[in-house]
Structure formats: structure tokens, C-alpha cells
Amino acid sequence: MEEDEVTIREQNFYSQVRECIICFLLFAILYIVSYFIIKRYKRKGDEQEDEDATVNRVSLFLCTFTLAVSGGAVLLLPFSIISNEILLCFPKSYYIQWLNGSLIHGLWNLVSLFSNLCLFVLMPFAFFFLESEGFAGLKKGIKARILETIIMLILLALLIFGIVWVASALIDNSSASMESLYDLWDCYLPYLYSCISLMGCLLLLLCTPVGLSRMFTVMGQLLVKPTILEDIDEQMYIISLQEEALQRKLNGGNYTADYSRKKIEHDLLNARSMKSKLERRKNASAWQRNLVYPAVMILLLIATFSSVILVSLNILRLLVDETAMPKGSKGSGFGDASLFTFGFAGATLEIILIFYLMVSSVVGFYSLRFFSSFTPRKDDTTMTKVIGNCLSILVLSSALPVMSRTLGITRFDLLGDFGRFNWLGNFYIVVAYNLMFAVMTTLCLVRKFTSAVREELLKAIGLDRLQLSNKSSDSPSPNGHQKSL
């Protein structure tokens, strides 16, 4: 009997060690990838040799950690889905014993914990630490900046928890909620994270439909269009004229204080870079020009309409079945049953659709005018913008599993703290969310594909002159018949 207990304890110990090693390796890979991504966009001029360099290194480490957690949140649902199918295909294989329900639940809990840590502690600390200078009267240095940052974090925490306490007291009229703060960990922190999750899902609701329509323009800029859709020779001629004009202005010293020599050199480099890209597009083969572009556009159409159809079907399920609610569904255990009719193929298609929604949400986020100034630029992004971008990506990626389950894109149950949000059990919020997503996506697609027809109709009836004031802000696309959203 004692030997059996020792054997069980040893197995549990080895299982926990194995899970820790796997989690560490996965996070190390994500951290390395995130580091190179940030270094690609971070401004090189931010690297000083004084205390500011130390502050920048600390902020860079925290931003890299946050971006790695964001990557883990994005991969969380696809990894869980594919792991469930692998366990069903090879239930007793020796080589996949490490892949079990305990590991998956541990990953969900770790991502939830680190998301909270980055959102409420690390990112505010990085921002305040970067902007701090030390209190007046104290000796300048790293210690003074750390002291100021900690005090600012304490004041921010008091402000946020005060707002959350008032909000929860207004919603719940019981005397306990208005008189006590003892249940801070059990009540107010989950309530705060639930509000942040709802805000992230609302941000995804705003960004994803815009991104789904914007993806056609983005892919059109990356791929080589057929000759009938764009005239590369004309574009190269225009770029060559711009390059010659900038070169003459630079050589002649014809620039003012507003249009300095540095800006002329920057515009000249951009013109030459655009010219080299156009030359590569011109030298593309015939199959790239006539086959790849239509195939990609068709795939985008299929993925977009598939997401709209799945959301529409989910609305019908919500109306007739209580288990369709994201918080009310209690499926079988991990690795016990498949969630797809077509097994591995269905899981693969679902994972592709989830990644497509995430990419579309990021594209839509940077396409919105309010967030367009956040767009990172290669080797020209300040550390403050890096912090803002990492925080935005964290909010979007943390809400991705919740949005995918709420819209019915996947039937995989939310694990850990992701499935404990109160608003997931509200029928009206979930149905309204699905309806708004379907309607907004349809309207964005209709606006996208009818823009050329709408412009021609306005020209035919003479109303295009009324929009002359807006044409300077809306730059046409290279093919001349599409407008960016």
C-alpha cells in the first residue's frame, strides 16, 4: 500500500516537473520571437549610455514579456483544439503522454495570471518608469525614478479599485458590497478583469469587421495584381518623377524650416524603396500575377463569409438551445470526444478561421483613425508607442478566446478564469454581440465592394463635386478604383 502511494507521488512529481519544463520552453520561444519583433520596430536612437539606457532596457524587457504573453493567449485556443484531436487519434501513445488535460488547464491558468499581471502591473510600471524623473528635492537616479513609479502605481491602484467598488456597489445594492472591501481578491479583482475582458471584446467587435473588409486592400498591396487591375509602368513613372524632384531639391538646397533637409532625405529614401518594390512586382512571373492574386481573394471571401454564416447559425442556436451559451455549456472532458464532425480537418479549418479573425482584428485596429497614430514603423517607433502597442495587442489577444466562443466560431469550452466572466451568462449581451458582429461585418463588406459603383453613380448625377474637400484625406489605391476604408 505504501509503495503504491510512493509511486503515485512520484508520478505526480514527474508530471508537474514535465509541465513546468514544457511551459518554460513554450514561453522561451515566444519571448525570443517577441524580442526580435520589438527590436525590429524600436527606434535605434533610444539606446543611450546613461540611466535612460537602463530604463529603456527594463521597459524593453517588460514589453517583450507582455508581447510573449499576448502570443500565448493567441495560441491558447488553437493549441487546445489540436491537442484534443491528437489525444483522440493516439489515446495510448507513449510519445504524447505529456499532452494531457492537466497541462492544458495549467496553460490556461498561466495565461490568465500573466495577462492580469501585465495589464495591471507590468505595463503601467513600464510607462511610469519611462516617464519618471524623480521627485523634486531628491537625488536624481534610478532609485528616485523607481520610488516615483511605485507611488504612481499605488495611487493608480487606489483610483481603479475605488471606481470598481463604486460600480459594483451601484450594481449590487446589498449592504455588504457597499460597506466591505474584505473580499477584494474573490470579488473585486475578478469583477475588474471581467470588465476589462468585456472592453476587449467590444474593441474586437469594432476592429474585426473593419479588418475583415480591410484585408482585401492589404493583400492587394502585398500581392501582384493582374495587369487589368493595375498599371505598374505608370506608378513607376510617377515615383521616378517624385524621386527626381526630391533629388533636385536636395542638391539645390531648396528647403525651408518646415521642410528640412532631413525630411527630404527621408522622403527620398521612401521613394526609392517604393520604386524597388514596384520593380520587383513588375518582374513577377505570369502565374504569380494571374493565379495567386485571384486565389487569395477567393480564399479571403470564403473565410469572411464562413465567419458570418457561423455567427448567424450561432444566433439561431442561442434562441433554441441553452447550452449554446458560452458560460452555460459543459462539454465532455479534455480528450474524451471530438468537437468536430470531420475530425482533424474540421479542427484545422477552425484554427485557420481563429487566426484569420485575430489578424483581421489587428489590421482593423490600426485602420481606425483613432488608433492609426499607434501604427509601428520599422526602426522608428518610440518606447512609449511600443508600450501602447504591446498593451493594445494584449487586450485584443486576451479577448480572442472569449470572442471566438461567444460568436460560436468554436465549441471548445473556455477554461480557467476565461470561462468565469459574469457577462458570458447574460443571454441578451451574448445575442446582441452576435447580431452586431454579423450586421457590422456585412455592412463593411457591402461598403467595400460597392465603393466603385457608388463613386460612378455620384459622378453620373454630379454629386462627386460635393466631396472635393474629403478627397485630400482619402488617398486612392494604386489601381484607381478602390478606396481604403
Swiss-Prot record:
Where located? Membrane
Those parts of the protein on the Extracellular side are 1-18, 83-109, 171-191, 312-338, 404-425
Does the record bear DNA repair in its keywords?
Answer: no
Any transmembrane segments, and where?
19-39, 62-82, 110-130, 150-170, 192-212, 291-311, 339-359, 383-403, 426-446
How would you describe this protein's topology in the membrane?
Multi-pass membrane protein
Q: Which residues form a coiled coil?
A: 261-284
Keyword terms, alphabetized: Coiled coil, Membrane, Receptor, Transmembrane, Transmembrane helix
Segments on the Cytoplasmic side according to the record's topology features: 40-61, 131-149, 213-290, 360-382, 447-485
Residues of the signal peptide: none
Which Gene Ontology cellular component terms are annotated? membrane
Please indicate which superkingdom the organism of origin belongs to: Eukaryota
Q: What does this protein do?
A: Putative membrane receptor.
Record protein name field: Limb region 1 protein homolog
In its UniProt entry, the species of origin is given as Xenopus tropicalis
Q: What is the lineage of its organism?
A: Eukaryota, Metazoa, Chordata, Craniata, Vertebrata
Name the gene that codes for it: lmbr1
